[in-house]
Swiss-Prot record:
Molecular function terms from GO: magnesium ion binding; phosphoenolpyruvate carboxylase activity
Subunit structure: Homotetramer.
Name of the encoding gene: ppcA
UniProt-listed SUPFAM superfamilies: Phosphoenolpyruvate/pyruvate domain
Superkingdom in the source lineage: Archaea
Keyword set, alphabetical order: Carbon dioxide fixation, Lyase, Magnesium
Entry protein name: Phosphoenolpyruvate carboxylase
Pfam families per the UniProt record, alphabetical: PEPcase_2
Cofactor: Mg(2+)
Organism taxonomic ancestry: Archaea, Thermoproteota, Thermoprotei, Thermofilales, Thermofilaceae
Reaction equation(s) it catalyzes: oxaloacetate + phosphate = phosphoenolpyruvate + hydrogencarbonate
Family classification: Belongs to the PEPCase type 2 family.
EC number(s) given by UniProt: 4.1.1.31
Length: 464
C-alpha cells in the first residue's frame, strides 16, 4: 500500500466560507477535481458532524472513487488533554463507523489513519491508540468485519515536540507493539502553523528541518519506514507550501516529506491554473531525502523561539482585539473557547488559533514573519546570519514576499514605533526594502473593521 501524497484539509485559511453541510461534497471534489489522494475529516476544535467520515466514504464510493485503494479518509480527533473526552470518543467512533461502511460497501478499509493533534506525551499516544484498537475489536467481533485497526498519527505542533520526534516515534511504535501490531510504516505529522505561533517562523522552520531528518533516523533505528506529513499553508509564517509564489523554495527547504497538506486557501483563493502548478511542485518534492539538519539547528531554534516570544508577547492584547474581527470560514469552536497560549518564562499569554493570529497581524500591518526581527538583528550583529540563511534557503525570498504587505506607518499608529524600528532594521540587515502594494495599504486604512481582514486576505490570496 502506497502512502498518500496530497492531503486536502478543512483549514479555515481561505476567504471563502465552507459550511460544514458542504464538506462531504467538498471531500469528493478534493478527490476528483483537486487530485488529493487523502482527505481529512477534522474534529479538532470544530463542529464536524459525527457521521461525516462515513458520508464521505459512501458518497465517494457512489461516484466511483476507489476509497481504501489509493484514496483515503483520515480523521483528526481532538486531544483528550485539551477537549472534552466525549468529543474524542465520538471522533474515534466516527472513524470506526466509516470503516464498517467501507467494508460493507467496498470491501476495503477507508480510514487507515487517525491524527492526534498537539501530541507531546507518550501517555496520550497510548491512551488514544488503545481506545481505537478496542473500538475496532468490538465491531469486528460483533459484526464480523476485518480487525485491521487504524494507526495513530502523532501531530507535533511545537518546537519542543518537533525536536523530540524520535522519542515520540519510539513511543508510538511501542504502543502499537503492546497491541500486537507490527507496522512496516509509521506516519508522523509535522505542523508548521502552531509551532510558528508559539515560537516564531525561524524557530519553527529550523525545528521542522530537524524533525524531518530525525524521522528518517528513527525509521532506521526501528527497522521500518517513517513517512512524514508536512503540515503547512499559504503564508510564509505557516509554511508557504501552498503559496504559488513560494512553493518552489519551500519544497526544496522541507525535503524529506512524504505527504503534504493542501489547505483551503490554495483551492479557493488561487486560480485553478495556479493550484495545478502548486500541486505539481508539491508532488515533485514528495519522497525526497531530508537535508542535513545537524550543526547548531536545535540551538538556533531555541534562541530564535525565546527572542520571538519576548517580542510577540508585548503585542498580544492588540492582536487579540483585532482577532475579533477576523471572520470564521469554517464551523469551528470559537478561538476564545479553544485558543492557544504563548509561553514566556513562567507566564502563559492567551492567543488566537494560528490562522486567526496570522490574519490579525497582517491586519495590523506587520506580517508575523517579521516578529523574528530581534533574532535576525542578533544574528546579523553576531555574524551568524549567513549560517541561518544556509539552514533556511528561501528565507530572504519569504521576507521579500511579505515586505509587500508590511505597512510601517499603519503599524506605527496601531502598535507603536518601537516594533516598526526593529522590523525596519531587520529588513535592512536582510538587504530588503519594503514596497507596500498601494491598493493593499488603502484597504487596510479605509475598509470597515468587520470586512478588513477578509478584503486584505483576498488581495494576499489567503486569510491567514
Amino acid at each position: 500500500m502506497e502512502t498518500p501524497r496530497l492531503m486536502c484539509t478543512q483549514h479555515p485559511d481561505s476567504t471563502v466560507k465552507v459550511p460544514v453541510q458542504e464538506e462531504v461534497e467538498e471531500a469528493v471534489r478534493s478527490f476528483l477535481v483537486y487530485g488529493c489522494d487523502e482527505v481529512m475529516s477534522d474534529y479538532e476544535g470544530k463542529l464536524t458532524p459525527y457521521a461525516q467520515p462515513k458520508e464521505i466514504v459512501v458518497k465517494a464510493g457512489e461516484l466511483g472513487v476507489p476509497v481504501g485503494e489509493g484514496f483515503y479518509v483520515t480523521v483528526r480527533a481532538p486531544n483528550p488533554r485539551l477537549e472534552d473526552f466525549d468529543r474524542v470518543d465520538l471522533a474515534l467512533e466516527a472513524a470506526v463507523l466509516a470503516n464498517y461502511y467501507s467494508y460493507k460497501r467496498l470491501g476495503v478499509q477507508a480510514v487507515r489513519w487517525v491524527v492526534l493533534p498537539m501530541t507531546d506525551s507518550a501517555e496520550t499516544v497510548r491512551l488514544v491508540q488503545r481506545l481505537l484498537a478496542r473500538k475496532t475489536r468490538v465491531l469486528c467481533e460483533e459484526v464480523g468485519q476485518p480487525c485491521e485497526q487504524a494507526q495513530l498519527v502523532p501531530l507535533l505542533e511545537d518546537v519542543d515536540s518537533l525536536l523530540r520526534v524520535r522519542e515520540i516515534l519510539r513511543d508510538l511504535h511501542s504502543a502499537l507493539a503492546e497491541l500486537g501490531s507490527d507496522p512496516g510504516v509509521l506516519r508522523v505529522f509535522l505542523g508548521k502553523s502552531d509551532s510558528a505561533l508559539k515560537a516564531g517562523h525561524i524557530a519553527s522552520a529550523l525545528s521542522l528541518l530537524y524533525a524531518l531528518g530525525e524521522s528518517a533516523k528513527a525509521g532506521e533505528e526501528l527497522g521500518l519506514e517513517v513517512k512524514p506529513i508536512l503540515g503547512g499553508g499559504s503564508p510564509p509564517f505557516r509554511g508557504g507550501v501552498n503559496n504559488p509564489r513560494l512553493v518552489g523554495v519551500e519544497v526544496q527547504r522541507y525535503r524529506g516529506y512524504s505527504t503534504v497538506t493542501v489547505q483551503s486557501a490554495v483551492r479557493y483563493d488561487a486560480s485553478f491554473s495556479e493550484y495545478q502548478e502548486v500541486r505539481s511542485k508539491l508532488l515533485g518534492g514528495a519522497g525526497g531525502e531530508p537535508g542535513d539538519a545537524g550543526g547548531r539547528v536545535a540551538e538556533l531554534a531555541r534562541l530564535a523561539a525565546s527572542m520571538y516570544r519576548s517580542l510577540a508577547s508585548k503585542y498580544l492584547d492588540f492582536v487579540n482585539e483585532y482577532a475579533r474581527s477576523v471572520p470564521t470560514t469554517r464551523d469551528r469552536v470559537s478561538w476564545r473557547e479553544y485558543g492557544r497560549a504563548l509561553e514566556l518564562e513562567d507566564k502563559l499569554f492567551s492567543a488566537p488559533r494560528a490562522i486567526v493570529y496570522t490574519a490579525a497581524w497582517y491586519s495590523l500591518g506587520v506580517p508575523p514573519t517579521f516578529l523574528d526581527a530581534d533574532f535576525v538583528l542578533e544574528a546579523y550583529r553576531g555574524d551568524f546570519l549567513d549560517e541561518v540563511l544556509g539552514y533556511l534557503p528561501g528565507l530572504e525570498e519569504e521576507w521579500r514576499y511579505d515586505a509587500q504587505f508590511y505597512l510601517p506607518r499603519l503599524a506605527g499608529e496601531r502598535l507603536g514605533e518601537e516594533l516598526v524600528k526593529k522590523v525596519d532594521e531587520a529588513l535592512d540587515a536582510m538587504g530588503l526594502r519594503p514596497e507596500p502594494l498601494e491598493p493593499y495599504e488603502k484597504l487596510a486604512r479605509t475598509a470597515p473593521a468587520e470586512l478588513r481582514a477578509l478584503l486584505l486576505g483576498k488581495v494576499r490570496g489567503f486569510l491567514g
